Amino acid sequence: MLSQKEHIITQQILRETKAKNKDNLTRTNAYKRFYDRHPEMKWSLLASFVSRNAGWSMTDLKGELFHPGLTDQQGHLFFTAYERANWLIFSDAYPQLLLYEWSKRCSQPLFHLLPYFSVSRFMSAEWEHFWLKHDTERLLYALIINEQYTIQSPIIQNPLLKKNVFHSIQYLFSEWGHFQTVVFPTVDGHLYGLTIRKFSNVKERITLGKKLAKLLFRADLFSDFYHFMHTVPHTGSRFDFEPFLGIARRSTPFLRTVYPVMTHSLDDQREDWFQKKLSPSLFEAEPLPKQIELTDWYFHKKRQLRFLFSLEHYFLHK
C-alpha cells in the first residue's frame, strides 16, 4: 500500500511523463531540461541528443532523399519503429528521472516506488547503488543498458517491424552503407558522431551508447555540443544543423508539419527483461574510434545514399 504522500508523488510523475511524452520534440526537450536541473544525470543529456537524431531520422522518411524510395506503407512502418522506440524509452526512463528528483527533494530515496512504473528490477538495484555511492558513470551505463534491453523485444524483435523495417532492403542499404549514424553538430560547422552496423543487436547498441557518452562528454568537445543543443531549437529537421555546414536549402520537413501525434498503449504487465545476470563487460568503458569528425563524411554519404536509392528504384520498378 502506498502512503498518501507516495500516491501523490506517483500520480504527479505519471501525469508529467504523459504530458512530455507527446512527440519527439517534447521528449527531446524534457530530457535536456532535466539535465540542466540535475547535471549529474549524464544519461539525460545523452538521451536528448540521441532523441534529436531519432527526430531527424523520422523526417528523413519524408525528405527528398528517402521519400522517393519508400512506399507509403514502408514510410509509415519505418516511422512507427522510430516513434515507438522513442516513446517506449521515455515511458520507461522519465519516471525514473522524476523519482530521483523527488528523492532529492525529500532527502530520502524513493526507489521502492519504481515497480509502480513497471521499471526493471535491474534499475531498482542500480538507483539504490547510485544513491549510496554517487557513481555517475555506472548509472550512466546502467541506463544505457536498461533502455536498449527495454526496446529489444517489443520493437526490434516485433515480427511486423522485424520483417518490414529491420530486414527491408532500404534498411539493409542503410546498414551496409554506414548510414545508421548518430551525429553531434556544432554551430561552427563541425559534425561529430559514430556509426553502428548491426542495429538489431542489443549489445552493439549498448556499445554504441557508451561510446556516444564518451564522445559527448569529452572535455575538448562538450561545450561545443552543449552550446548547439542549448541555442538551436529542435524542429525534427536536419536543417537544424545543415546551415552551419553551408547547406542553404532545406531538404527535410519540420516534424510537426508531417507527423500527427501518435497514440500509444503500454502493457502495464509487460515482462521484465532482466531475467539473468549480465556480463560485467557491459559496464566497461569503450574506446573511441580514430574517426569521430564526420563533416566531410556527411556530404559523401548523402551522395552515396542517393545513388543507392536510385539503384533500388531502378531494379524494383523497371
Where do the protein language model's features map onto the residues?
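Functional cation/ligand-contacting sites centered on basic and imidazole/sulfhydryl donors
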Residues: 1-318
